[in-house]
UniProtKB/Swiss-Prot annotation:
GO molecular function: structural constituent of ribosome
Family note: Belongs to the bacterial ribosomal protein bS16 family.
Gene encoding the protein: rpsP
Name assigned to this protein: Small ribosomal subunit protein bS16
PANTHER family: 30S RIBOSOMAL PROTEIN S16 (PTHR12919), SMALL RIBOSOMAL SUBUNIT PROTEIN BS16M (PTHR12919:SF20)
UniProt GO BP: translation
Amino acid sequence: MVKIRLTRGGAKKRPFYHIIVTDVRSARDGRNIERVGFYNPVAQGGEKRIELDLARVDHWVKNGAQPTDKVRNLIKEATKSQAAAA
């Protein structure tokens, strides 16, 4: 089964997450199929909080990938922010 989930990066006390498409059997920070964006929960100043390639996410969801609950919420947030920017 293929999932869209977060993988942690960044420094201690300053997390940064990549949003990836991966096989469910892979470790959290293990192999991935494709990186479709990032999430920065502690963005400051002019830093972006969410960057997401919605076309690729839509492609993977149509092909059976299941987003985790957190990623599903991030997709909704990214969709709203892109609609507001347009």
